[in-house]
Amino acid sequence: MLIKITQGAPYGVATGADGALWFTLTEPGAIGRLVPGEEPVVHRLDPADGGPTVIAPGPDGAMWFTEFRGNRVGRITPDSEVTSYEADSPYGIVAGPDGAMWYASMRSDRIGRIAADGRRAEFTLPVVGGMPSGIAAGDDGALWFTLNQAGTVGRITVDGETTLHPLPTEGAAPVHITAGPDGALWFAEIGAGQIGRVTPEGKITEYPLPDRACRPHAIITGPDGALWYTAWATSRLGRITTGGAIRELDLPGAEPHGLTTGPDGAIWVALESGALARVTP
């Protein structure tokens, strides 16, 4: 099923505590909300030049999102009240185990933290030009992140202690990362056309995809216990089991980016061609 979004091109999508799907529209600078079965509602941001990208639910019942171009992290409540916080080039964002929101700062080689009261802290990573991109909360109580240009997956504790795990494949360019159902972290290697897995101890496994030029982008754990990913260049939705079995589905639209498990148990995908796609696992 395809839901057209006439107001812009969806980029990130996540499910909120209110049982709705929330999505970002990088252009024209807006946040959308969709209750399955109803019409989408779009809230234009002010200012609208920030380029909202990744969105995630917070522990406070609000949705938090990054504005990469605007150097802001935003918070929007179910009744569309928006608060913004200064942050340098934020991209990935996730709720941490400490009740704060954590984000990856692409241009400054930092991982940032925003508390519920707006207090912000940043931790400088031991790498220059690494381009922190995706971030996820691991089952081990730490945050895990990708360094796109450094070809590395990292781990940071809530106290800021960092460990880096370089990837075996040169030019892997990892982007999004998620906690898997097996206690490991899974990530998309957009440069190598692979899905990667790293254990809490740092053991890395890489799974080549059927089309190595597919540009895998986002990845989540689905309701069926498998990992689901978007293949941006081939307009496909992929599924990989924890044992490495892969299958892919053609999507009824182009340029898939973010994805989430919806309140209805389906996989919802943000398509930059101007739609949200619904796929039954």
Residue map of PLM features:
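Beta-strand-rich domains and repeat architectures in extracellular enzymes and scaffolds
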Residues: I3-A30
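Beta-rich catalytic cores
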Residues: A9, G51, R69, S89, ...
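Residue-level detector of Asp-centered blade-edge/turn motifs that repeat once per structural unit
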Residues: T15-D18, P57-D60, A95-D98, A137-D140, ...
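Conserved beta-strand positions in repeat-built beta-propeller and related beta-rich domains
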Residues: F23-E27, M63-R69, M101-R107, L143-Q149, ...
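Short loop/turn segments that connect beta-strands within beta-propeller blades
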Residues: L34-E38, I76-S80, I114-R119, I156-E161, ...
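Blade-level signature of beta-propeller repeat domains, shared across WD40, Kelch, NHL, RCC1
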Residues: E255-P281
